[in-house]
Amino acid sequence: MNPSLIRKLEGLIERHEEVQAMLGEPDVAADQDRYRALTREYAQLEDIVHAFQQFRQAEENLDATRQMLEEDDADLREMAQEELPLAKATFEEQEQALQVMLLPRDPKDDNNCYLEIRAGAGGDEAAIFAGDLFRMYSRYAERQGWRVSIVSCNDGEHGGYKEVIAKVEGEHVYGRLKFESGGHRVQRVPETESQGRVHTSACTVAVLPEVPEAEQIEINPSELKIDTFRASGAGGQHVNKTDSAIRITHLPTGLVVECQDERSQHKNRAKAMSVLSARLQAAEDERHRAAEQSTRRNLVGSGDRSERIRTYNYPQGRLSEHRINLTLYRLGEIMEGDLDCVISPMIQEYQADQLASLAESN
């Protein structure tokens, strides 16, 4: 392993001991916010310390096996020859696992996020597919113990959504969903198709990390146009009584955000401002990425409709993830929320790219 990584690990072990001592101090225990923050840090460091111990054990085992190859005893040499492949494989596995844990973490990975799904080419069928995608993500969120709440939606004429924006809250939400941004294409026979022909439709998905209030981009109130209107859709008689829905237009960029989820105009405005802040921050982050002109693949999509990332082929029960050449014939399970079989390989590929970049820089 690279000496600089070993030094970094030794520093983390020292920090682990330091945090452990701090957690036993009365003044830390009295400060709940500080105590919770240190507890989280300790848990993360504990995993790294444990992984480092396993790495050292594998390293010692490999060294001992290699030394046995130099023994005079023929039986010992033969035994070492048999054990060497497993010892090397275990060492390499532990080394890679440890390196992955040391990769720079995106601080936004632990944030909640906004999930935006828009119907593209394909008319009614695209709107129906947008509804299917929203259901898929909702089922996945349920499996993860996350909470999903709709911020705004525009229903399709024959089901589904022309557009739906939802907030997803829970642990490590953005870190799991950030690879979903981009163009999603579906190939299937619509229910209204009498000839049995396969149609192709498309939707775009954008996943935006929620920006904590303290980090939000400062928005000049004079650059906002705020309209109120009556909410539509489910909600009983109340929806026709008050202009509780909010539409905010950010004049410099032309970004428009609507929210009609809450009965309170004040709450709708707060939600809309939060979505607007997330979109402005995402646009700023995209500008930074473009300025860096990175030669590495960017597996975290931008939500651009021209960036087709995935195809859902219903006649073949096939899902194709184009960014990593992954093909799975379990579309039914995936549409029911079993998304880890797609998301986990994406994360692994992303980490492999990061490791390659780290090796180049060292």
UniProtKB/Swiss-Prot annotation:
Keywords of this entry: Cytoplasm, Methylation, Protein biosynthesis
Processing after translation: Methylated by PrmC. Methylation increases the termination efficiency of RF1.
Database matches in Gene3D superfamilies: 3.30.160.20, 3.30.70.1660, 6.10.140.1950
Record GO cellular component, one term: cytoplasm
Coiled-coil stretches noted in the UniProt entry, renumbered to this chain: none
UniProt keyword Protein biosynthesis present: yes
Residues with N5-methylglutamine modification: 237
Entry function: Peptide chain release factor 1 directs the termination of translation in response to the peptide chain termination codons UAG and UAA.
Protein name, as recorded: Peptide chain release factor 1
Species the sequence originates in: Aeromonas hydrophila subsp. hydrophila (strain ATCC 7966 / DSM 30187 / BCRC 13018 / CCUG 14551 / JCM 1027 / KCTC 2358 / NCIMB 9240 / NCTC 8049)
